């Protein structure tokens, strides 16, 4: 970065500070990960300069022959990786992929169903503050109060009563396997379309470690980062019969020109996900998450639904008298990066000061952490939670965290 250092020291310094932060902290945010050096190089390539409105072979600008080539690579690899009939790799984000899917599959004012945000859903699945809550008539479904898993029986009851045009599944904080076959059966009973957002679990699905929604869903949306370890962006998979509607919803309805440097990076990430090592990585992520859940239980902490089937755990801190906001700040000061999160059915919580925290192992596993390091990290978490606001404890843990982190290079950076 010699040119940037000279031309814009302020931005250069911010990047260097962020690099140091990445190296000296343990990232347990379930939606974050580290990309490879190859992905970073593709995203910083000369494709940044190219405008490519339209689709391969049908561009509105000249000079797109190589943009066509790289987008076709990304499309073909996404279709192969997820066994899909059609793929659109242009969405700038998961939220924009979702918006395009809505515009293609339903009309404003139609009834849709989505998992309520406080039960693990996502803003774009029907939240009142999101475009979905403003443009559509939303019926929320939730979890069973005893099992803290999706209440499929009540979901079916609500679907029969309200006859939605589309049911949305997928989550941002749900630690259990999603039953796509049951969702499909419910949709068929009410003649509804099924949209599945696999942003969090795309890597697990690609590796065959979580059931795939592709055989059941009319449309599947996702991000290309998180467990997939690609650049920040989105993509859409669908059945061929919806391909034209999906493509038109992305361009020209939702977006203009795609970010071709990001499309190139997506192509690289999809190729990386086809390698045997990617499956090994996902298996290690699941193993680490099981170890994390067990160690958290040993600390006496309550896990929502009692455990996890995927890459994340949701911890209810209310029994120990700590809120998620204070926990997030204290852990950050100690070099452990997590996010506060609402807990299903918890009382006296807000989005800003929720009752719990969400932890995940994708980034730590990418860095090379195994069960031993996860156990050590959970031990530090327990120490911080028992000593909220104790600066001496935070400084002690921070020093130990930095010492551990120096043994594990950050992918894409420490090479």
Swiss-Prot record:
Where, if anywhere, are coiled coils annotated? Answer: none
Q: Which cofactor does it need?
A: pyridoxal 5'-phosphate
GO molecular function list: glycine hydroxymethyltransferase activity; pyridoxal phosphate binding
Per the record, residues carrying N6-(pyridoxal phosphate)lysine are 226
Q: Does the keyword Repressor apply?
A: no
Q: Which GO terms describe its cellular component?
A: cytosol
According to its UniProt entry, the function of this protein is described as: Catalyzes the reversible interconversion of serine and glycine with tetrahydrofolate (THF) serving as the one-carbon carrier. This reaction serves as the major source of one-carbon groups required for the biosynthesis of purines, thymidylate, methionine, and other important biomolecules. Also exhibits THF-independent aldolase activity toward beta-hydroxyamino acids, producing glycine and aldehydes, via a retro-aldol mechanism.
| Quaternary structure and partners | Homodimer.
The record, for NCBIfam families, names:
PRK00011.1 (NF000586)
Would you tell me the protein name for this molecule? Serine hydroxymethyltransferase
Q: Which organism is it from?
A: Dehalococcoides mccartyi (strain ATCC BAA-2100 / JCM 16839 / KCTC 5957 / BAV1)
Query: Mind giving the lineage of the organism this protein is from?
Result: Bacteria, Bacillati, Chloroflexota, Dehalococcoidia, Dehalococcoidales
